[in-house]
C-alpha cells in the first residue's frame, strides 16, 4: 500500500493547519522532517519541521504518530499541526511531494482506507461525508447517528435474519429426501413476512432523510405585489430580492438558503401569479412559479389583505395542501374585524411584513412543517439514493420468495436479497461503487 498525504484542514489563513500522512512510510517521513528517531505512539511532540533538501525551517509544529491499527485509517498515520498560513501550506506540500514513495491523496482516500481496513462500514463512511457537509443542527444529528453505526446496525440485523433463512433452507437442499419440519417452515415464513413488512415500511418514509440532507424546498407564491419578495428578504435577513410597487417586478425564481429550527430550507421567491398578463417574459415567470410550487416541499401562498377577494384564482388555491402556509399580508391596512371568505376554508396567518407584525408565526409554522416532514424518529432514515436503490431491489426479490417454488430458486431470492443489503454496508465485494462514494469527499479526508 502506498503512503499518502494531504492537508486535512482548509487551505488558507487559520490558527492551525493539519497535514495527515498514512501508510507504511509515515513514521519514516516524520523522522526525515524532524531529525528525531524515536516517537511514542499517540503522544504529541513539539518539533521543528525542516525541508530535507534545503534544510530550511518550515515551522515549529506539533506532531503525533499513530501506530497501526490504532489510527483513523488502520495504517501507520502521522499528523503534523503547523501554523495556518498559505506559505507554510505550500512549503509543506512541496516538501512532501519531493520525498520518494509518497504521493498526494485522492479525494476521500483516507476514509476509503479506513473502510477497507474495517474501521467502519460504508454507511458510516457516508455519514462522515454528511457530517463534514452538515450546515444545520438537524443535518449534524442525522450524520452523527449514521457515522456512529446506527444504520449499519439496522441493515446488519436484516442481513443476519436473511442468512439464517439461507442456512435453514440450504440444509434441506443438501438432503432433498428429508421433509422440512413445520417448525422450520413457520420460522422461515414468519421471518420472511416480518422482513417484508419492515423493509416496506422503511422505504415508505416520504424520503425524510434525503430531504434533511438536501434541504426542504420552500416556494413563496401568490399574486403580484403581495409582499413575497419582502418576505424573502425578511427571512434571509438581507436584501436579495428587488422590492417594487410595480406588478411583475420579479420575473424569475430567486433562491436563498436558510436554517429554521435546525432544518435546512431552500427559499424560492417566484413571479406573481395573475391571469391577465400579456407580457411573454412575465408569462414564463408565472409558469415557472407554478411549477416551482408544485415541486416544493413547503409552500407559502401570500395574499394582499386589500386585494384578497379579487386576487383569488384556481391557479393559486389549487396549490394549497397540508404543507402550505396561507398568509394574508398588509393587515395593518385593513380593519382588524374584517373577515375573509378564504379563512373559512383554510387556516390563515395575518401578518404585516413591512411593519413586522406576527412574522414569528411564519417561522414557527415553517419549522413545524419541516419537523413533520423530516423530524427524527427512533429508527434512522434512508439518507441517500444509493441505499434506497438497493433496498428496493432487496424488497423485490424478497417479495418473489415463496416456499411453494423450487427450493433452490427460493433460496436464491433470499441470497440476492442479502447481497443487496450487503451492498449498502459494504460487507460484499463492492469495488465498483467505492469510487462513486469516496470521490465526493474532500482531499485530506
Swiss-Prot record:
Sequence similarity: Belongs to the TRAFAC class TrmE-Era-EngA-EngB-Septin-like GTPase superfamily. TrmE GTPase family.
Residue span(s) of domain TrmE-type G: 215-371
NCBIfam families per record: mnmE_trmE_thdF (TIGR00450), PRK05291.1-3 (NF003661), small_GTP (TIGR00231)
Subunit and partners: Homodimer. Heterotetramer of two MnmE and two MnmG subunits.
Identification of the protein by name: tRNA modification GTPase MnmE
Residues binding GTP, per UniProt: 225-230, 244-250, 269-272
EC code: 3.6.-.-
PANTHER family xrefs: TRNA MODIFICATION GTPASE GTPBP3 (PTHR42714), TRNA MODIFICATION GTPASE GTPBP3, MITOCHONDRIAL (PTHR42714:SF2)
Gene Ontology terms for molecular function: GTP binding; GTPase activity; metal ion binding
Cofactor: K(+)
Top-level taxonomic group: Bacteria
Annotated GO biological process: tRNA methylation; tRNA wobble uridine modification
SUPFAM superfamilies recorded: P-loop containing nucleoside triphosphate hydrolases, TrmE connector domain
Lineage summary: Bacteria, Pseudomonadati, Pseudomonadota, Alphaproteobacteria, Rickettsiales
A Pfam family this chain is assigned to: TrmE_N
